[in-house]
Structures are given as structure tokens and as C-alpha cells.
């Protein structure tokens, strides 16, 4: 499997303390710092490679968007990161089904629950 150029997952809850601890463990990241209304930023580092991190609270239907802007993460894909986040943070996590191509349904996502249950869902963008 080819590594994703970046990682984006959606968290049903944004427990900042737990999220900061997880990002620190996985990416050697400093705690997230406020970066505007409902936005938080930090940077992680793996093997000397810097990883910009952006959290946007309530990005989509109340879910927070966590974006890791680098291919140099511990996870090859959004799905792998979503599984790790759901297990560690104890919340529902959603992500794309894979690399998006023209003609793909943009509303299809993978839902990962804290107990490891996964399913494909329709998640249309409501604009909220």
C-alpha cells in the first residue's frame, strides 16, 4: 500500500488532554495551542521529519477534523490512523474510505468505533 501524502480523520469528541497525550506519544508533539476560533495547531516530529498538525473543532456535523500534513506519520492511511485514534481516545472516528478519485462518492466514509467495530457509512456534508 502506498503511503498517504497526509492524514485526516474526524473525531466525534475532541478530548484535548487525551488527544495531546496521544499526539505526544505517537508524534513527539507539543500540546495543541489555540490558532483562531475553534482551531488548534502544533507540530510533531518523527525521524527528524516535521509534521504540521491542525485540529478544527466542529468541522463537520460536530466532529473535529484532525489533519496531519505529512506522509511521515506512523500510519500509512487515514484508516490506520482512525483505528488507532478510536482505540486510544475512546471515541468514534470517521475517515475517507481511501484515496479519492473523480467519480467516487464523496459522502462515503469509514466509521470506526472505540470497540473496533467498523462499517462504511453515508455521511453527506450538511455544511455544519
Positions of PLM-derived features:
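Short, extreme N-terminal segment that most often corresponds to the first beta-strand
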Residues: 1-22
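A general secondary-structure signal for short beta-strands and their flanking turns/coil
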Residues: 2-6, 61-63, 86
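Short amphipathic alpha-helices in soluble, non-transmembrane regions
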Residues: 18-28, 81-84
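A common structural junction motif
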Residues: 24-32, 88-92
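Short, intrinsically disordered low-complexity segments
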Residues: 31-75
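Short, surface-exposed coil-to-beta transition loops
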Residues: 49-52, 78-79, 104-107
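Long, charged/polar, surface-exposed segments that mediate recognition or autoinhibition
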Residues: 71-78, 82-87
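Acidic, proline/glycine-rich low-complexity IDRs
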Residues: 83-84, 88-128
Amino acid at each position: 500500500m502506498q503511503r498517504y501524502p497526509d492524514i485526516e480523520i474526524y473525531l466525534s469528541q475532541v478530548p484535548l488532554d487525551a488527544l495531546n497525550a496521544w499526539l505526544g506519544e505517537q508524534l513527539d508533539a507539543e500540546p495543541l495551542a489555540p490558532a483562531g476560533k475553534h482551531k488548534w495547531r502544533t507540530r510533531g516530529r518523527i525521524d527528524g521529519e516535521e509534521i504540521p498538525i491542525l485540529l478544527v473543532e466542529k468541522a463537520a456535523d460536530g466532529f473535529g477534523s484532525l489533519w496531519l500534513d505529512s506522509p511521515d506519520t506512523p500510519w500509512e492511511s487515514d484508516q490506520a490512523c482512525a483505528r488507532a485514534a478510536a482505540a486510544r481516545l475512546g471515541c468514534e472516528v470517521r475517515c475517507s474510505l481511501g484515496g479519492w478519485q473523480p467519480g467516487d462518492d464523496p459522502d462515503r466514509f469509514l466509521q470506526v468505533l472505540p470497540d473496533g467495530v467498523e462499517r462504511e457509512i453515508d455521511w453527506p456534508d450538511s455544511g455544519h
